[in-house]
Amino acid sequence: MDFRVIGDTYRYGVRVSAIVEKDGKLLTYKVEDQNHLVGGAILVGEASREAVVREVKEELGVVCEVEELMFVVENRFDYKGELHHMIEFHYKVTLIGEVPSHTLDEGKYECEWIDLQRLSEYDIRPQYLIKELPLWKAGIKQIDIGIE
C-alpha cells in the first residue's frame, strides 16, 4: 500500500525521487510540457532508500546505486483546487544500465536528458530544482515550499 492519502479536496503522502546526472545533464521524463524526475510514493513499511531503487527499476527497468540523500522537501501546493502536501526525499543515484527511450510504467513517457546549465528553460517538477540543484555541493538540504 502506498504511503499516501487521497481525499476529495486533498492529497498527502511521502515520496522519493531519483536525481540522475550524467555528462552535465539531468535525467527527466516528459508529461505534456513538463519534465519530471523518476520517482513515486513510498510503500508503507518501506525505507526511502529502498523506495528509490524500486521506483527506478519499475520506471526505467534498470538497477541503480543510491549515492546520497540530497534534499528533504516539504512541498505544499494547490493543483486544480486540490491541496497537496508531500514529504519528499530526493536521492542522488547512479544508473547501472542504459536508460530506455520511454518509461516502462503505464504512461510510457519519453525520457529526456536536460543540460544542467539550461534548467531554467524547462518546466521542471519539482520546480525548486531549477534554483537548488546547481547550488548543491554535498550534504542534505532541507527545503520548505509553501502554498503561493
Question: Can you describe what each PLM-predicted range is?
Answer:
Residues G13, E21, L37, C64, ...:
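Short connector loops at helix/strand junctions that flank enzyme active sites
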Residues F77-P100, E112:
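Active-site-adjacent beta-strand/loop module that shapes the phosphate/pyrophosphate-binding cleft
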Residues K22-E58:
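Conserved Nudix-box catalytic region and its N-terminal flanking loop in Nudix hydrolases
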Residues T103-L135:
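NUDIX/MutT-family hydrolases
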Residues M1-S17:
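Acidic, metal-coordinating catalytic segment for phosphate/diphosphate chemistry
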Residues D8-Y12, G81-I87, T103-K108:
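A generic structural micro-feature
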Residues Y128-E148:
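Charged phosphate-binding loop/patch that engages nucleotide di/tri-phosphates or the phosphate backbone
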Residues V63-V72:
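A short coil-to-beta-strand element that immediately follows conserved catalytic motifs
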